[in-house]
Regions:
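Glycine-rich phosphate-binding loop plus the immediately following alpha-helix
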Residues: 127, 150-192, 217-226
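Short beta-strand scaffold segments in enzyme catalytic cores
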Residues: 16-22, 135-137, 143-147
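Short glycine-rich phosphate-binding loop at a beta-alpha junction
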Residues: 72-83, 261-273, 294
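N-terminal beta-alpha supersecondary unit
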Residues: 2-85, 118
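A contiguous, well-structured pocket-lining segment that forms one wall/lid of small-molecule binding clefts
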Residues: 188-266, 275-285, 289, 315-319
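Conserved phosphate-binding/catalytic loops in two-lobed NTP-binding clefts
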Residues: 111-112, 266, 283-307, 322
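Conserved phosphate-binding catalytic cores of ATP/NTP-utilizing and phosphoryl-transfer enzymes
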Residues: 1-5, 112-134, 311
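Glycine-rich phosphate-binding/hydrolytic loop that grips phosphoryl groups
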Residues: 118-120, 296-333
Length: 333
């Protein structure tokens, strides 16, 4: 029974080396080692540097996680890992390490799509979330509106045609020298600022549910380049206005999709879902329309391995398994 089985999960798709251990509904360990300090001086994630850091840290983090859970490696029943999308080098480090663990203890090895992990993240702390529901997945590399009719039945209604929302935050933050990652930096600088101080565009696309953020980024940089030196605009007002434009754009299409499909359950995930303004407006929309809303905590919105464990567990329950549930040693000759 899955209630008693211990699932070990790995997440190394970008710049977090994350390992989690799940037993039934109980999250025993959720370790996240961030590389923000490493990449900050570059103004963004450098793929080769990220993969090297994963390789250097993953072994120690694995043993520390086992010790924290008071477990032996032989206690693990299932091993799971992210298999993409993400940075290839980073993914390879986690995939190979996880697969070697599964092989060494002769246990099933399951792969999980990174975005399905974000989609399942609310389940970590709230097992009442059930389909059908509409989810808004917003990360550094992806912006998606997904209708979940049943577990394993995911209908992509909208996506970005250029930059993702996370990229829009990061690129402008780099341009302004606000810091990295861009989303948290802009949110912090914008605290107390007037979100309506600057009129920035809310880009539209030909497809009603798709997104485009490159034009917003360009409009914001052009605004700054043409700013009168005597203008008394504050950093807080500018950051708050830019953040508001991104949040409004995200919610505009999402609200339309929810209203047109008539779903009564909504959720969200991805690193940008940690943004306090986006969460606030999502909750207001749910309250005003009598919708059930399921959001992971800000910490569980960003990349973590707990979501990989839960997604793997959910895939097993619903029989939506990415690869055959086999013991690797039985197929290695």
């Amino acid at each position: 029974m899955l209630d008693d089985q211990i699932i070990l999960g790995f997440e190394t798709s970008c710049d977090e080396t994350a390992i989690a251990i799940l037993k039934g509904d109980e999250l025993l360990v959720n370790t996240i080692s961030s590389q923000v300090d490493i990449h900050e001086k570059f103004g963004g994630v450098v793929p080769e540097v990220a993969s090297r850091a994963h390789a250097e840290m993953i072994r120690n983090i694995f043993h520390a996680s086992l010790n924290s859970a008071n477990l032996q490696i032989s206690d693990i029943d299932i091993v799971s890992t992210t298999d993409g999308p993400g940075l290839v080098g980073s993914l390879v480090v986690g995939y190979n390490f996880a697969k070697s663990i599964a092989w060494s203890i002769d246990k099933p090895f399951l792969t999980v799509d990174h975005m399905v992990g974000h989609l399942a993240a609310p389940l970590i702390e709230n097992r009442t979330m059930k389909p059908p529901f509409m989810t808004l997945l917003v990360s550094g590399g992806h912006t998606q509106i997904v209708l979940v009719e049943e577990w394993g039945n995911y209908q992509l209604l909208g996506t970005t045609i250029d930059d993702a929302a996370g990229e829009a935050f990061d690129k402008l933050s780099r341009f302004c020298g606000f810091g990295f990652p861009g989303g948290p930096a802009i949110q912090k600088i914008g605290e107390g600022g007037d979100p309506n101080k600057i009129e920035l565009p809310r880009p539209k696309t030909k497809h009603e549910y798709n997104y485009s953020f490159s034009g917003l980024k360009t409009a914001a940089t052009n605004f700054l380049n043409n700013l009168d030196p005597n203008d008394k605009l504050t950093k807080a007002d500018f950051a708050a206005s830019y953040q508001e434009a991104i949040v409004d754009s995200l919610l505009s299409n999402f609200v339309k999709a929810v209203n047109e499909t008539g779903v009564k359950n909504i959720s969200g995930g991805g690193g940008v879902m940690a943004n306090s303004r986006l969460r606030e407006k999502m909750n207001i929309f749910a309250e005003n329309n009598d919708l059930n809303i399921y959001l992971p905590t800000p910490k569980l919105s960003t990349d973590n391995a707990a979501m990989i464990c839960v997604a793997a567990q959910n895939n097993l329950i619903t029989n939506d398994i990415n690869i055959d549930d086999v013991r690797l040693s039985s197929i290695i000759t």
